[in-house]
């Protein structure tokens, strides 16, 4: 191992994790939980550097690597509706939630992110967690969310916020009791 390689690896790690020079000099750095996947990815490529990973970090790392094998199963009413990759997306959301984190589902349009999120929200409701949840999307998709909610998760009450100010004021009276409130980016401004 060449020292230059180790220093380069340390520099890359520092850039990835945005560590201060003082933290590096101290030999100890604490990072927020949401940085664990980034840290794990960065450490996997550092063959010349030694790192101590505690049990909690190893457990978190394993759970993110094994999302597909997690114990989270979609709500019974959606289990046979979701495709395999959608069940994986559901498990990803549940894994993140299990650590108090949020995340983003991103793929090509039309692959079912809406139903993945709805399955997650239904599971939260079934487990007794208090809703409502707010969905902010393009105006062209507000009614789509409401239709998908009625189709796949009729157990969730959904309020689609649209229309003029008077209509929206009437809808606002329903928000507290709704499981899901859907609105557009424009109306959120």
Placement of each model-derived feature along the sequence:
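Charged, low-complexity
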Residues: 1-103, 156, 175-181, 185-187
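Generic structural signal for beta-strand residues in well-ordered domains
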Residues: 75, 82, 98, 110, ...
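Conserved SF1/SF2 helicase motif Ia
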Residues: 100-104, 108-147, 157
